[in-house]
């Protein structure tokens, strides 16, 4: 059985690495979308893999991720 929290965490971390975005920059970008948080909280959420689907989508939007490949082709 797949660990969905770890899967979402891995996707988010991979996109952050691909876009070269660290937690403080992600917080700045999230603020532009009206999402208020701090770098420590964001880093902890991502590190634990315990975040909502809304937070996941907000992060992807903040990083301007337009395509996400989920398959294993």
Model-derived features with residue positions:
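DNA major-groove recognition helix of helix-turn-helix/homeodomain DNA-binding modules
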Residues: 52-70
């Amino acid at each position: 059985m797949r660990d969905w929290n770890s899967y979402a965490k891995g996707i988010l971390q991979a996109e952050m690495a691909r876009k070269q975005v660290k937690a403080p920059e992600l917080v700045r970008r999230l603020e532009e979308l009206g999402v208020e948080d701090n770098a420590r909280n964001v880093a902890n959420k991502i590190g634990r893999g315990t975040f909502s689907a809304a937070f996941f989508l907000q992060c992807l939007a903040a990083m301007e991720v337009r395509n996400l490949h989920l398959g294993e082709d």
